[in-house]
Amino acid sequence: MDRTETRFRKRGQITEKITTSRQPQPQNEQSPQRSTSGYPLQEVVDDEVLGPSAPGVDPSPPCRSLGWKRKREWSDESAEEPEKELAPEPEETWVVEMLCGLKMKLKQQRVSPILPEHHKGFNSQLAPGVDPSPPHRSFCWKRKMEWWDESEESLEEEPRKVLAPEPEEIWVAEMLCGLKMKLKRRRVSLVLPEHHEAFNRLLEDPVIKRFLAWDKDLRVSDKYLLAMVIAYFSRAGFPSWQYQRIHFFLALYLANDMEEDDEDSKQNIFHFLYGKNRSRIPLLRKRWFQLGRSMNPRARKKRSRIPLLRKRRFQLGRSMNPRARKNRSRIPLLRKRRFQLGRSMNLRARKNRSQIVLFQKRRFQFFCSMSGRAWVSPEELEEIQAYDPEHWVWARDRAHLS
């Protein structure tokens, strides 16, 4: 019984403490009252200090109040910021696509929503070290200027070849019939006045003058072939001052190769420049003999009679010319002179052969400089002749010879 009484007493003291702590205290009192049990009572203010009210109770505020406070703060900040404008959707308009008399065909076209403000915003978001004002084209132009300066320096050391631009194509009206018009594709000629000046300058060369006077039959130098020479000058892409005598003959040989089927006419150019090559005559005679032998199978049987015929021809000539014995002593001298003459001709033949090979090599290089465009249309030839129709070269027409 003593234990139960002590327990009830302790419980009563605890309840008294709780009741006294809950009672309101007067404001003029500075010190709290002491309980009869001897335990000090603490003054608790709910607004300032959050102390434990009872054992086992968590004094922290609930999670809902903290989340609600965060939501209130987020709502206050969002209220201060302006509302974000949504991008307008692209509009669609109707534009006129085709007019046909009183009928009109419309086409639906979408309008782009991109504004200048978007470009400014994009430029402002670039890196701070990047200048958005100059376009990329200026940087490329700077590279081109640097390359041009380097090329000018290299031009002083070695001349740079300028490639000729390819001819452009345009559409011209060929025929008009009422309200209908027929179009035809036509190439624009690249012949410039400077090419005519280079051609006229070469005509004053004494070698070219002798060549034109030598070709009386106009087999290799009529007006159309000479007009093709000017067209080739424009396509080769060389400067006008760079064309020399060799370029005239190269272009003329190439023009004959394109237009003429006669191989002898092209060989006449070699005959005039380097002389007739007589070193090929023995080879031609040998081939001619082989061809005749293949055509006549009986030539082998007659071959055994050749020494007998030579012997009889010699005897006949000796009997007809009694002075043959006296002239016999001159044979070694004649043989010696003939050998010297043949040797000098062989040296010239070797020289001429090397020059012809060099000419053919330069002709191929000239053909490559024109990018293989050796064909010239009749319309372009007429345009070239119409530039100066009173020129004396255009009077070299084969029709006037007959």
Curated annotation (Swiss-Prot):
Region named Disordered: 1-89
Polar residues biased stretches: 16-39
GO molecular function, one term: protein kinase binding
Record InterPro entries: Speedy
Residue stretches of biased makeup (Acidic residues): 76-89
Pfam family of the protein (one): Spy1
PANTHER family xrefs: WBSCR19-LIKE PROTEIN
Family: Belongs to the Speedy/Ringo family.
Name the UniProt record assigns to this protein: Speedy protein E5
Taxonomic lineage from the root: Eukaryota, Metazoa, Chordata, Craniata, Vertebrata
Chain's gene name: SPDYE5
